[in-house]
């Protein structure tokens, strides 16, 4: 067959408009300047709510896609500025208020702290003894471990980084202003996906990974090799001088001297010649493939992670040369999508290119779904393959990082549902999507949703039924009739099979590796300083049961979000939903039973199920790790676990979860008064209050409050102190938004205080 050369694309040019929008502080100083109605100023208290709701809804400011794109682009720089300021604050605390040097000297006994409370009226009780003579609040962000892995050896270096982050923040703020007011990209620049993919893949991910690999190789590895030797009690000698403490370690730039660094890694003597002559094995002492964990630190081998980032860099730099721009070579995304047809999928992906280059909601939705999923995968990798030194034995940090990444993932995935529904309402054009995949999914949405609903009902009744059965049998004193590892077994055979494959496979796939990918699949206990860093996680009946609760709650969350997206424009009940918009409380007066059908309401309801779902995930993790993994290694080699292995028997019943997990482990937060964790006791109480406060918004109607307000306004009129701005009750949607925000805030802070008071006390 002959292959005709691909059509040359139109030449790509980075085109900008000069000075498109004047810089006017006078205009910005006027609240609501972006909306004609809001700019008139407040008539009623609803104004302030609408101001917040619409400030960042760029679609409502203008219908010009180019201007919307520029606003989003500019806002990204603003977001980056905020992130740099936040990071600067974290590094500044590490530099100014922390025991980083003390922790570095003795990471197995000293706990990380980067905040010291000032004594005003007794709060200094919060400054607990974290070891090494330092008193402060124990932090659980994992920053100390990250800093050690990066090669920081003193607080001054953290200071410099904090200042550098502020400089970067200033640069980002300037860039955000410059690319909106001085040189704003044209729409075609935002829509040029091939160039965008090439630059993001090769530049951001490829060169980003390469520069990090370079930092790891030239700074992190020598510093960490010296620190590990000190911690192992066998300090190394450099240029005839024993490196006995972190203070003796040469500064990063000194390792540019090949004669110095090659005393630690002889491979550096090979120089770049070995690279160009393909004699890559010369670098095998600092680019390794060991597998498993470093026995001194309980973290991944940093020589493995340097190798990993170098490999990732190569992959992404190659990937960044795949898409066709000015050189008539490579892929065209439009061609790929339009060629993507199956035997049963009609026009396939035709039309999706146009959607993803004109609807940023559609684009954002996909990105949120992927990023949310990645965040949840990261949560699991944090304990399966702990990446930083001494992270795995810092149990409060392990629990915090897992919980954090799980919740972030949940919020992002709900956000994916939200923006998919907004896309359907605001940007979807049925005439341009005839018989493509999106159209076909929408046409058989009833089949999809009814089947998904059936799955949810099946999972819910069966998984819950197993627990109810066990509670009943235990209450009747018939343990032999329970589902358990010692009676009627429900072993997770597929999960055990996967664990076994992963434990055995590296023997064949990586014969030179020292250990398998992760100890959680099977292998030996890795202990650091007498504490378990990693151990095989044995799964049994209790895990099988709670796993099916996970399956149930995740499927219900997916059902709510997917129903919201697929029925965002129309349904049998409300055929003209597309005209009502993304958020509306009900289909007007005179149509009862049409409330909570808008796209927004599905996001609202999905948030509750997301929270419900992920609470059980983090409870499962917290209890399982305390019961079966975390603990102290006794002199005879056995492990005394924090919760003494009670998960397998107690987690079989609902009563067990309530009594042996929630109630038993809440004793630390409930009895924290008068101790350095007493703040968690107050947060625990306060967060319960915030959570209960949310119910006032969720369980009452707007009319009740409007009636009350009018009576209060009457009293003010009597006293001639009536306000100029007329008070109004929250709209139905606003009430629900305030309700769900407090519900989630209260729930998350309750869990946070419960987890940390417990694990700081026992971990």
Curated annotation (Swiss-Prot):
The chain crosses the membrane at residues 72-95, 158-181, 197-221, 305-323, 360-383, 399-425, 447-469, 544-562, 602-623, 677-699, 737-757. This is Photosystem I P700 chlorophyll a apoprotein A1. It is found in: Cellular thylakoid membrane. One of its GO terms (molecular function) is chlorophyll binding. Pfam families: PsaA_PsaB. Gene3D superfamilies: Photosystem I PsaA/PsaB. It comes from Synechococcus elongatus (strain ATCC 33912 / PCC 7942 / FACHB-805). It is a multi-pass membrane protein. InterPro entries: PSI_PsaA, PSI_PsaA/B, PSI_PsaA/B_CS, PSI_PsaA/B_sf. The gene is psaA. [4Fe-4S] cluster binds at residues 586, 595. It comes from the Bacteria. Its EC number is 1.97.1.12.
């Amino acid at each position: 067959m002959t292959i005709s050369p691909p059509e040359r694309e139109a030449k790509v040019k980075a085109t900008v408009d000069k000075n498109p929008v004047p810089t006017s502080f006078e205009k910005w100083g006027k609240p609501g300047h972006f909306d004609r109605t809001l700019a008139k100023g407040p008539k009623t208290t609803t104004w302030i709510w609408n101001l917040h709701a619409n400030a960042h809804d760029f679609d409502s400011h203008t219908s010009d896609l180019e201007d919307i794109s520029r606003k989003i682009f500019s806002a990204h720089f603003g977001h980056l500025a905020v992130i740099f300021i936040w990071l600067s604050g974290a590094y500044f605390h590490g530099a100014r208020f922390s025991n980083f040097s003390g922790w570095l000297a003795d990471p197995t006994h000293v706990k990380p702290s980067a905040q010291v409370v000032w004594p005003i009226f007794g709060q200094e009780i919060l400054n607990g003894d974290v070891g090494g003579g330092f008193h402060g609040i124990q932090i659980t962000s994992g920053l100390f471990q990250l800093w050690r892995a990066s090669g920081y050896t003193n607080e001054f270096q953290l200071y410099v980084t904090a200042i550098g982050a502020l400089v970067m923040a200033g640069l980002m703020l300037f860039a955000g202003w410059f690319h909106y007011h001085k040189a704003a990209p044209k729409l075609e620049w935002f829509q040029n996906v091939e160039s965008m993919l090439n630059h993001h893949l090769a530049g951001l991910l490829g060169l980003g990974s390469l520069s990090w690999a370079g930092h790891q190789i030239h700074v992190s590895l020598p510093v960490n090799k010296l620190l590990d030797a000190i911690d192992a009690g066998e300090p190394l000698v450099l240029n005839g001088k024993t490196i006995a403490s972190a203070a003796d370690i040469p500064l990063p730039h000194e390792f540019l001297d090949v004669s110095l660094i090659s005393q630690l890694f002889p491979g550096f003597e090979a120089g770049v010649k070995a690279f160009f002559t393909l004699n890559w094995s010369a670098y095998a002492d600092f680019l390794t493939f060991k597998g498993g964990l470093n026995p001194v630190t309980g973290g991944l081998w940093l020589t493995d992670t340097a190798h990993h980032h170098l490999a990732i860099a190569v992959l992404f730099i190659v990937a960044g040369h795949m898409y066709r721009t000015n050189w008539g070579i490579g892929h065209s995304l439009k061609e790929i999508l339009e060629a993507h047809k199956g035997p049963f999928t009609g026009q396939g992906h035709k039309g999706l290119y146009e959607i993803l280059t004109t609807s940023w909601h559609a684009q954002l939705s996909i990105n949120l779904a992927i990023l949310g999923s990645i965040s949840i995968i990261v949560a699991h990798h944090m304990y399966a393959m702990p990446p930083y030194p001494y992270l795995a034995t810092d149990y409060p940090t392990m629990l915090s990082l897992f919980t954090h990444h799980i919740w972030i993932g949940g919020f992002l995935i709900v956000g994916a549902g939200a923006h998919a529904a907004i896309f359907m309402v605001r940007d979807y054009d049925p005439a341009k999507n005839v018989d493509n995949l999106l159209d076909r999914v929408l046409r058989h949405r009833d089949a999809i949703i009814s089947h998904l609903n059936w799955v949810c009902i099946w999972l819910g009744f069966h998984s819950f039924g197993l627990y109810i059965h066990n509670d009943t049998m235990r209450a009747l004193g018939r343990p032999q009739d329970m589902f358990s590892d010692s009676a009627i077994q429900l072993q997770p055979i597929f999960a055990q099979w996967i664990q076994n494959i992963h434990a055995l496979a590296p023997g064949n796939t990586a014969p030179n590796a020292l250990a398998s990918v992760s100890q959680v699949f099977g292998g030996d206990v890795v202990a650091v300083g007498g504490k378990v860093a990693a151990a095989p996680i044995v799964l049994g009946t209790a895990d099988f049961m709670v796993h099916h609760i996970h399956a149930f709650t995740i499927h219900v969350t997916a059902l709510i979000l997917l129903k919201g997206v697929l029925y965002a424009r129309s349904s049998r009940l409300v055929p003209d939903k597309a005209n009502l918009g993304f958020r509306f409380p009900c289909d007007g007066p005179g149509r009862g039973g049409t409330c909570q059908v808008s796209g927004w309401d599905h996001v609202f309801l999905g948030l509750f199920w997301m929270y419900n779902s992920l609470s059980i995930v983090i409870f499962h993790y917290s209890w399982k790790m305390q019961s079966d993994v975390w603990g102290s290694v006794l002199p005879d080699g056995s492990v005394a676990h924090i919760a003494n292995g009670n998960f397998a028997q107690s987690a079989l019943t609902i009563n067990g979860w309530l009594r042996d997990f929630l109630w038993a482990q809440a004793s630390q937060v409930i009895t924290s008064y008068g101790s350095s964790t007493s703040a968690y006791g107050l947060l625990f109480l306060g967060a319960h209050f915030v959570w209960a406060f949310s119910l006032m918004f969720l369980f009452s109607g707007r009319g009740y409050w409007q009636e009350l307000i009018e009576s209060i306004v009457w009293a003010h009129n009597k006293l001639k102190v009536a306000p100029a701005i007329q008070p109004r009750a929250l709209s139905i949607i606003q009430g629900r938004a305030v309700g769900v925000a407090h519900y989630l805030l209260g729930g998350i802070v309750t869990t946070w205080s419960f987890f940390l008071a417990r694990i700081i006390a026992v971990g």
